Amino acid sequence: MSAFTLASTSGGARAGILHTAHGDVPTPAFMPVGTKATVKSVDPDELRALGAAIVLGNSYHLHFRPGEELVAELGGLHAFMGWNGPILTDSGGFQVFSLRDTLLEADDDGVTFRSVYDGRAERFTPELAARIQELLGSDVAMCLDVCAPPGVPPAELEEAVQRTTLWARRQRDLPRAPGQLRFGITQGGLDTELGRASCRERVLYTV
């Protein structure tokens, strides 16, 4: 069965169902952010009562504290959080590229940055991002991408799209947690053609 079922459309809008190992998610959906494996001031029972269908966890922060290996030893992110519903983890790319003061270098192999926790130089690659999320055991893992800020020159925006595609290709067939989906991320900023090209490529690397 496909991971996504289209339920209905109206003009350019559509509604569907995302099928994951821990349940279905009606879309469009509001996704509460549990950056460090918890939604601030809301416990799992309250999340369920509020009707949350899926929760987001942040790979960047979980990698540094407490670490994906410890989360795996404790049974994975669902057990660690006390949440038995679907979980999506981002790749850490947004944090790396949006915290511009900590960014040191980005190339086709990966990105080097300073940790916001202790200032040490760290290196993220597509392979590491995939491994972190495999150990976390989320239902949906996101590919590492280059998040270009608004207003960058066209050449930099195009480079971000090309590098995001290159990284998605490398991640497509890497190991995943049982039942884990892996989605690519579309880049291109406000450039319609770049966005369309990125979207077409991303469909090929979503598994």
Region roles according to the model:
Residues 3, 162-165, 171-200:
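Glycine-rich phosphate/ribose-binding loops and adjacent secondary-structure elements
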Residues 1-176:
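Non-catalytic, usually N-terminal nucleic-acid engagement modules in DNA/RNA processing proteins
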Residues 201-207:
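Positively charged, low-complexity/disordered segments
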